[in-house]
């Protein structure tokens, strides 16, 4: 299977998000990379589903709560930026203060 570097990045991100989902299901709190992966994957999947940039910026803030991440992670994570593919091209989606 031949994958471009971008496709490899998306696959790695999806794998990290899947791991984060499993850890959440076991009741574990997520660390920084897991939180970023889960939020990023939600944005990418939302773009694939046809949502707008504005909808995805809002969706990204609903993925995780402070109770689901390790102490200090919410304060460390100010923005999550993801290049998502939309029907009209690739756009940068920025989720500000994603963990509330």
UniProtKB/Swiss-Prot annotation:
Instruction: Give the record's GO CC terms.
Output: cytoplasm
Q: What is its EC number?
A: 3.5.1.5
Entries under InterPro entries matching the protein:
Urease_gamma (IPR012010), Urease_gamma/gamma-beta_su (IPR002026), Urease_gamma_sf (IPR036463), Urease_subunit (IPR050069)
Question: Which pathway does it operate in?
Answer: Nitrogen metabolism; urea degradation; CO(2) and NH(3) from urea (urease route): step 1/1
Q: Which Gene3D superfamilies match?
A: Urease, gamma-like subunit
The record's keywords, sorted A to Z, are: Cytoplasm, Hydrolase
SUPFAM superfamilies in the record, alphabetically?
Urease, gamma-subunit (SSF54111)
Compartments reported by the entry: Cytoplasm
Q: Does the keyword Cytoplasm apply?
A: yes
Catalysis: reaction(s): urea + 2 H2O + H(+) = hydrogencarbonate + 2 NH4(+)
| The keyword Lipid metabolism belongs to this UniProt entry's keyword annotation | no
Q: Name one Pfam family in it.
A: Urease_gamma
The principal localisation class reads: cytoplasm
Q: Which GO terms describe its biological process?
A: urea catabolic process
Q: Where is the signal peptide, in residue numbers?
A: none
Q: Could you say which protein family the record assigns here?
A: Belongs to the urease gamma subunit family.
Q: Tell me, how does this one assemble?
A: Heterotrimer of UreA (gamma), UreB (beta) and UreC (alpha) subunits. Three heterotrimers associate to form the active enzyme.
List the protein's name: Urease subunit gamma
**Which species is listed as the source?**
Pseudomonas putida (strain ATCC 47054 / DSM 6125 / CFBP 8728 / NCIMB 11950 / KT2440)
């Amino acid at each position: 299977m031949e994958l471009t570097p971008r496709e490899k990045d998306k696959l790695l991100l999806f794998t990290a998000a899947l791991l984060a989902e499993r850890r959440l299901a076991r009741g574990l709190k997520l660390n920084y990379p897991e939180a970023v992966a889960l939020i990023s994957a939600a944005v990418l999947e939302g773009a694939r589903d046809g949502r707008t940039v504005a909808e995805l910026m809002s969706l990204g803030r609903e993925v995780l709560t402070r109770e689901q991440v390790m102490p200090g992670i919410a304060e460390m994570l100010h923005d999550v930026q993801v290049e998502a593919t939309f029907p009209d091209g690739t756009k940068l989606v920025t989720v500000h203060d994603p963990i509330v």
